[in-house]
Amino acid sequence: MPRNTALEKYRNIGICAHVDAGKTTTTERILFYTGLSHKIGEVHDGAATMDWMEQEQERGITITSAATTTFWSGMDQQFEKHRINIIDTPGHVDFTIEVERSLRVLDGAVVVFCGSSGVEPQSETVWRQANKYGVPRIVFVNKMDRSGADFERVCAQIKTRLKANVVPVQLNIGAEEDFKGVIDLIRMKAIMWNEEDMGLTYELVDIPADLQDRAEELRMEMIEAAAEASEELMEKYLEGGELSEDEIHQGLRARVLNNEIVLAFCGSAFKNKGVQAVLDGVVRYLPAPNQVPAIKCETEDGEPASRPSSDDAPFAALAFKLATDLFVGNLTFIRVYSGVLKSGDAVYNPVKGKKERVGRIVQMHANKRDEIKEVRAGDIAACIGLKDVTTGDTLCDQEDVVILEKMDFPEPVISVAVEPKSKADQEKMSIALGKLAAEDPSFRVKTDEESGQTIISGMGELHLDIIVDRMRREFKVEANVGNPQVAYRETIRSKVEQEAKFVRQSGGRGQYGHVFVRFEPLDEVDENGEAKVFKFVDEVVGGVVPKEYIGSVAKGIEEQLNNGVLAGYPMIGVKATLYDGSYHDVDSSEMAFKIAGSMALKEGAKKANACILEPIMKVEVVTPEDYLGDVMGDLNRRRGIIEGMDENPSGRVINALVPLAEMFGYATNVRSISQGRASFSMEFKKYAEVPNNIADEIIKSRNS
């Protein structure tokens, strides 16, 4: 069966932003203009097509990334039909994992900013993630009809706060309630959308006289940016100072694909102005699957390899999201990088070492689905019938095995105990939690060995609230939820040398392991800039500890890191160097050296000036000027350190570092201080030492 749409005409894009920048509304408008959704769903009516979980419609925020397929031929039908796969991602910081997963499988992104609030903390997180995966992007400055909206100010913020090279391709005509339309800087005409048909049609008119000069200045900057794409364009520009429309498009596209510039559009999705031009921008400037570098992967032997985006290459896809559907069971969302997959085909999962058969393949439109017979390179679809696949697994051809890069998931920072309300709920709860944990790798479940309680951990209070809410609604499990617990850690502060000997000899074969290990604080970061947990160095000379036992010593130390010496919290930031020891020809074994390693850490850490660490959150509070003093006083009482202040149209912005332990219930508190007018967001920043008096309390309560 040949392709319906050529690969060059595909666009896999994500729509990402901060909470409330108007991302879901923008997606709804895209579905309306591309003809998929005949009635526009508004978020504030709780009817948006892409927000399909009950909790999302109630809370007015997007939690899971819904994937949808749609088609676009341009505002003037100037393109051949392009197929656009859109993933709508959540903007709340507790759901960063969803954004990370989506960006991993996309080729391009539209980042939405609010015209009045501009760059917010979550925008920085999303931007960082898009940089990590090298995703080319364009910017849509939305809500230009809001009070305080200022397109050029937001572009300047993106330059300074996100260090991005922003090139506006439009200029707004009016702002706030006078927002009328946009100037297209390439055609040098004003676009006025027709309000009667919700913006389906528009007219091109002359640029208002008062904006002519500014439009010409911005146009010159844009043409310069396009000319820098190649020597030919630069020469032509230097000779005549002008480029044709096609040359401008070509130059801008080349630089967006290289992640050198970010084009800025503006409008108001809610007022049906501007989204149509963004769709043209997606087709014109964002890459097709075969215009991004071939996906990097590894062979089974760990050798680096890559897969071109082509139907003729062997099949390879990444499972980037799992969802449970009440009617069909497990849905596995996949992004196909190469090859073809037909329903009923067997696929191999090299991460699990298992072969599975794909039952059916469906194309998702938010939560409606159309069954399809096959998927090809570049497609995003959901498979039904896969049992043992988890997020981040590779599915591939068994004859040509590759492993696509694994995704790194953040460690949870907050835990609560959950108890089923009745015996009948007990079993249902463990099934429900298991399914929810399979869907969301940033959510963990474990049983506390001492108390026997079930502990769930996640990225924030809202994250866990929604998990408990989903248990109740989707799995009909009633549970009591305990107070939140902080994920404390332990570390060492000084260098110490420790001998440990594990000997059992009482006739017959005994056990013998003897090591000398140096422990010291580890101040190193990984490629994501996060602090490393553990590093093991082998400095054994002359074979005093045989090679085959060295890995066992490392393993013993690493396992012992899970039980800190002060209050039993996991230890981080430890460097261990094995430098001496001895062995016995008959009695030494891997087990004996593993136990010796764990004994060395247990004893050594006690002498190495151990301390307790707590998660510190980066908190940003936006508050009207009148409440500034009260909000800052409250942050100081919470052991917060104020790092700086900014201004934005909603008031003052306070940036602070505050221990997570002091942030429980902050949402309610800050609302009451500011009479509901302040808002805040927080994300994990780092671990830091707990003050002595608080550390004593933590140790006492853990050991009692």
Curated annotation (Swiss-Prot):
Q: Known SMART domains for this protein?
A: EFG_C, EFG_IV
State the source organism's domain of life.
Bacteria
Every copy of the tr-type G domain together lies at 8-290
**Subcellular locations according to the entry:** Cytoplasm
**One of this protein's GO BP terms?**
ribosome disassembly
Query: How is this protein annotated for GO cellular component?
Result: cytoplasm
Q: Which residues bind GTP?
A: 17-24, 88-92, 142-145
Q: What is its main location?
A: cytoplasm
Q: Show the PROSITE patterns listed in the entry.
A: G_TR_1, G_TR_2
Kindly indicate where the leader peptide sits in this chain. none
Q: What GO molecular-function term can you cite, just one?
A: GTP binding
Q: Which UniProt key words apply to this protein?
A: Cytoplasm, Elongation factor, GTP-binding, Nucleotide-binding, Protein biosynthesis
What is this protein for, i.e. what is its function?
A: Catalyzes the GTP-dependent ribosomal translocation step during translation elongation. During this step, the ribosome changes from the pre-translocational (PRE) to the post-translocational (POST) state as the newly formed A-site-bound peptidyl-tRNA and P-site-bound deacylated tRNA move to the P and E sites, respectively. Catalyzes the coordinated movement of the two tRNA molecules, the mRNA and conformational changes in the ribosome.
Q: Which family does the similarity line name?
A: Belongs to the TRAFAC class translation factor GTPase superfamily. Classic translation factor GTPase family. EF-G/EF-2 subfamily.
Q: What is this protein called?
A: Elongation factor G
Q: What is the organism field in this record?
A: Francisella tularensis subsp. holarctica (strain FTNF002-00 / FTA)
What gene is behind this protein?
Answer: fusA
